[in-house]
Amino acid sequence: MKTPHKKGAAKEQMGEGVGHHIGSTTIKKKKASQKRQRSRSSSRRSIVGCRISHGWKEGDEPITQWKGTVLDQVPINPSLYLVKYDGIDCVYGLELHRDERILKLKILPDKVSFSGVSDVRLANTIIGKAVEHMFEGEHGSKDEWRGMVLAQAPIMNAWFYITYERDPVLYMYQLLDDYKEGDLRIMPESSASPPADREPEGVVDGLIGKHVEYTKEDGSKRTGKVIHQVKAKPSVYFIKFDDDFHIYVYDLVKKNS
């Protein structure tokens, strides 16, 4: 059984992110600067699959040191990388070569383990499914989080992307181990839910690369971009907001219907 999510500790070290979200999302037109940005970034040597280390300096806070694995480079914004940092359960989206808060970025000689999943059939079974994920809370209590398994993670193939109702950001765990230990349970599918292998009615194509505007409960707005569509659930997308390094996961059909 795992301890609670380590996102909170990461926010204290890397700067405060935004917590739970209740609001509305509006799709905006894509800006024209994307093509120039892609041409500048494409000349760099690929660091996907590499182990990295760097310092992090934000405002007057002391410098902290980070190590992690580069999981992916976002095609719609090649300067943006998805990174799994050691000891942190959520996936971060950072412009590793551009973000001024990142100090002394180094490519480490460490080898990344490319071991595959131990049970392919079980992996295919849990992807796209609503689940209940058990964590160990304070004083040994059990804390149950409802969420959805989104995909097998790139590079670290024994890990899976997952998001949760109470915290809709991108996490990754070794879920097959959790399933076999009884800490991950697949929830019964609702008769109203569409099959996982069929696009639900109302899915909007072509949202990747679109700019979004999010209105929070207090009326304030934040902007971001749709960077990925979840294959197992085509109505679900990853969004990277301009003011946050977390990757948010939204059902845009549900949000905009």
Curated annotation (Swiss-Prot):
Q: What gene does this protein come from?
A: Spin2c
Q: Which GO terms describe its cellular component?
A: nucleus
- Keywords, A to Z? Cell cycle, Nucleus
Database matches in PANTHER family:
SPINDLIN
Stretch list, region Tudor-like domain 2? 127-176
Residue segments, region Tudor-like domain 1: 48-97
List the GO biological process terms: gamete generation
Q: Which GO terms describe its molecular function?
A: histone H3K4me3 reader activity
Its source organism is Mus musculus
**Cited InterPro entries:** SPIN/Ssty, SPIN/Ssty_sf
Q: What does this protein do?
A: May be involved in the regulation of cell cycle progression. Exhibits H3K4me3-binding activity.
In residue numbers, the region (Tudor-like domain 3) covers 208-253
Question: In which residue ranges is the amino acid composition biased (Basic residues)?
Answer: 27-43
Which region ranges are annotated with the description Histone H3K4me3 and H3R8me2a binding?
Answer: 136, 244-246
Pfam families found in the cross-reference section: Spin-Ssty
Residue segments, region Disordered? 1-47
| Oligomer and partners | Interacts with C11orf84/SPINDOC.
Query: Which superkingdom heads the taxonomic lineage of this protein's source?
Result: Eukaryota
Q: How is this protein named in the record?
A: Spindlin-2C
